[in-house]
Swiss-Prot record:
UniProt keyword annotations, A-Z: Repressor, Stress response, Transcription, Transcription regulation
Cystines in this chain: none
Record's protein name: Heat-inducible transcription repressor HrcA
InterPro entries: GAF-like_dom_sf (IPR029016), HrcA (IPR002571), HrcA_C (IPR021153), WH-like_DNA-bd_sf (IPR036388), WH_DNA-bd_sf (IPR036390), WHTH_HrcA_DNA-bd (IPR005104), WHTH_transcript_rep_HrcA_IDD (IPR023120)
Gene expressing this chain: hrcA
One GO process term, biological-process aspect: negative regulation of DNA-templated transcription
Pfam families named among the record's database cross-references: HrcA, HrcA_DNA-bdg
Length: 349
């Protein structure tokens, strides 16, 4: 999670804050002292409750809308809630079994799409999943196809049956027979290894003097070094954007338009997800913690997903600050675990 905001509160204040935020998340209306007296389970007078609420407001945890006598949580209030007050409601065993069934079979892209759709459908918000870098996947086969005198298409097939085409411009002209021998050499020596591992080996070998290498090896390493340039145009799967239009919390059309532009470009969402890829467990960005003005009314709950102990990407849920964190946080955790397991055979070593 992001930096916590945890002023010291006594047990009554914590209970009232927890109850107020839980009630507000549920019904979206400012919460008054009478409602809290009924819901909090504390044997204290409404006057005492009002005094405690005033103290919580002074601490910046609550706010009083001008049109209501009740109070609503601030971003700091939500932060304290998710850091130390929320009581998680994880998915049931039946739900987890259904998730595993829905994310069984299919290629990597299909699984990513399924994960994003599940997150959106089960929360009624936006589901996002960053795609793994192809360099992290196991290489199974390569073919070279000449396009013209100067360009060659490298066709890479991975262990998860995904195919990637890369166009390269070699330093010399290769005859079809040479390309076949080079592909045979690379297939014989590098099958079963990741592109990142292959790149390290190739660059190491290229440092050796050219006259120390066989001609076939030299040509193979030359083509491989060009083919294995890292691909930075990683993708992201976004599902359920239109669900946000029905939320009363996001009724500002100008702000909503900006948000949809972010979804369309994907770049800023991907950058936000990448900030969490090296952090274990769930991370939560509330409002301005995202670093984007257009998302100051938004929360993002993320978790990395991994296969065979290697982190591949990040998934999460984007929704209003007034979201059911008690359900969304454990759901994101579970979907990340299920997706990672589904990607293990046979996509990773």
């Amino acid at each position: 999670m992001c930096a916590s905001f945890s002023p010291t509160l006594d047990s009554r204040s914590r209970q009232l804050l927890r109850t107020l935020i839980s009630c507000y998340i549920q019904n979206g209306e400012p919460i008054g002292s009478k409602t809290l007296a009924q819901q909090a389970g504390l044997d204290i007078s409404p006057a005492t409750i009002r005094n405690i609420l005033a103290d919580l407001e002074e601490l910046g945890l609550l706010n009083s809308p001008h049109t209501s006598a009740g109070r609503v949580p601030t971003a700091h209030g939500y932060r304290m809630f998710v850091d130390s007050l929320v009581q998680m409601q994880p998915p049931s065993e039946d739900d987890i079994r259904r998730l595993r069934v829905e994310m069984t079979g299919g290629g990597t892209q299909t699984l990513l799409g399924s994960a994003s759709e599940i997150l959106s459908a089960m929360t009624h918000f936006v589901g996002v999943v960053s795609a793994p870098r192809r360099e992290q996947f196991v290489f199974r086969h390569i073919d070279f196809v000449p396009l013209d005198a100067r360009q060659i298409m490298a066709i890479l097939i991975f262990a998860d049956n995904e195919v990637q085409n890369r166009v390269i411009e070699p330093r010399r002209v290769y005859e079809p027979g040479e390309l076949e021998r080079v592909s045979n050499y690379l297939n014989a020596h590098f099958i079963g290894r990741t592109l990142a591992d292959i790149r390290t080996t190739v660059l190491c070998e290229l440092r050796k003097a050219k006259d120390e290498m066989e001609q076939l090896l030299a040509h193979s390493l030359d083509l491989a070094s060009q083919m294995l340039v890292p691909n930075d145009s990683e993708d992201i799967v976004v599902t359920g954007q239109t669900r946000l239009m029905a939320l009363q919390d996001l009724s500002d059309m100008d702000r909503l338009r900006e948000l949809f532009e972010i979804f369309a470009s994907k770049r800023e969402i991907l950058q936000l997800l990448e900030r969490t890829i090296d952090a274990p467990g769930v991370r939560i960005f509330i409002g301005e913690e995202t670093g984007m003005v257009s998302m100051e009314d938004i929360s993002l709950v993320t978790a990395p997903y991994a296969a065979h102990g290697q982190v591949l990407g990040v998934l999460g849920v984007i929704g209003p600050k007034r979201m059911a964190y008690d359900r969304v946080i454990p759901l994101v955790q579970v979907v990340a675990q299920v997706l990672g397991t589904a990607l293990e055979p046979p996509t990773m070593p």
